[in-house]
Swiss-Prot record:
One of its GO terms (biological process) is lipopolysaccharide biosynthetic process. NADP(+) binds at residues 11-14, 36, 59-60, 81-85, 154, 180, 185. The keyword NADP applies. PANTHER family: GDP-MANNOSE 4,6 DEHYDRATASE, GDP-MANNOSE 4,6-DEHYDRATASE. InterPro entries: GDP_Man_deHydtase, NAD(P)-bd_dom, NAD(P)-bd_dom_sf. CDD domains: GDP_MD_SDR_e. This is GDP-mannose 4,6-dehydratase. Pathway: Bacterial outer membrane biogenesis; lipopolysaccharide biosynthesis. It is an enzyme of class 4 (lyase). Catalyzes the conversion of GDP-D-mannose to GDP-4-dehydro-6-deoxy-D-mannose. Its EC number is 4.2.1.47. Belongs to the NAD(P)-dependent epimerase/dehydratase family. GDP-mannose 4,6-dehydratase subfamily.
């Protein structure tokens, strides 16, 4: 029997890579999409799968539309990737972030509990829940201390998933994913901001790159690797929570160096520090310990940061040269 999966946030970076993986595994893939005037499906087109997905109208803020999508798709698996996922924007849109990233998870879990209790559920949690770090490396037992409305909303989504698993016996797992990037990353995220700027500077269309805290350290991986961990979680007999990370941390400054060196430039000639890009509360270091995911799921990242950044720079060079 063909397995069916419902993916929220299917037009985002992770949703597109996950949809491609599921299609390759023979799934029938349903995507929850809100009606938007702007073109939101460009990532699915980039991967050549836009026409292979069954789209369901819905909005995570609207419980009724979420219920309709679950009933119509009759999925064996639901992957909740829908989110207002940019930390910086959550300071300007704290209520919207809370509704979508927090309350929206409850809408989906409640729909599964009522109408499809055998469905397996994946919740996209985030390393931003750790925030003000309480340990050198963060694992599944590290205390949470979120430092942004985004982190707080995601923590609600994480704990309501645990609550429904323990209270109602749902097969509901959370992946606590550390930063993961790709050529499909939104331009508002620092990695794409850097690789896009590198391409424009190399092609003579931009003179400088302005950033905030370049000493912040992040554990960066490739989104295409990380969606495999999501799928593996829902293939386990027992639902659980897993940190998904590389276990290696790099500063924003060093990431800039990798990107500029790929096109034969010195980042110090172009990087300018701009106080406007500093946040009200910064998370200085995020470093994940993926030992549990490696042990239980057999998952390991396959793409190094150097390979990832080079891949992104090359993609942006192609994009910018076509403009």
């Amino acid at each position: 029997m063909t397995r069916s999966a419902l993916v929220t946030g299917i037009t985002g970076q992770d949703g597109a890579y996950l949809a491609k993986l599921l299609l390759e595994k023979g799934y029938r893939v349903h995507g929850l999409v809100a009606r938007r005037s702007s073109d939101t499906r460009w990532r699915l087109r980039e991967l050549g799968i836009e026409g292979d997905i069954q789209y369901e109208d819905g909005d995570m803020a609207d419980a009724c539309s979420v219920q309709r999508a679950v009933i119509k798709a009759q999925p064996q698996e639901v992957y909740n990737l829908a989110a207002q996922s940019f930390v910086g924007a959550s300071w300007n849109q704290p209520v919207t972030t809370g509704v979508v990233d927090g309350l929206g998870v409850t809408h989906l879990l409640e729909a599964i509990r009522q109408f499809s209790p055998e469905t397996r559920f994946y919740q996209a949690s985030t390393s931003e829940m750790f925030g003000l770090i309480q340990a050198e490396r963060q694992d599944e037992n590290t205390p949470f201390y979120p430092r942004s409305p985004y982190g707080v909303a995601k923590l609600y989504g994480h704990w309501i998933t645990v609550n429904y698993r323990e209270s109602f016996g749902l097969h509901a797992s959370s992946g606590i994913l550390f930063n993961h990037e790709s050529p499909l990353r939104g331009i508002e995220f620092v990695t794409r901001k850097v690789t896009d700027a590198v391409a424009r500077i190399k092609l003579g269309k931009q003179q400088e790159l302005r950033l905030g805290n370049v000493d912040a350290k992040r554990d960066w991986g490739f989104a295409g690797d990380y969606v495999e961990a999501m799928w593996l979680m829902l293939q386990q007999d027992k639902a659980d929570d897993y940190v998904v990370a590389t276990g290696v941390t790099t500063t924003v400054r060093d990431m800039c160096q990798i990107a500029f060196e790929h096109v034969g430039l010195d980042y110090r000639d172009f990087l300018k520090i701009d106080p406007a890009f500093f946040r009200p509360a910064e998370v200085d270091v995020l470093l994940g310990n993926p030992a549990k995911a490696q042990r239980v799921l057999g998952w390991k990242p396959r793409t190094s940061l150097d390979e990832l950044i080079r891949m992104m720079v090359e993609a942006d060079l192609r994009r910018v040269s076509r403009e």
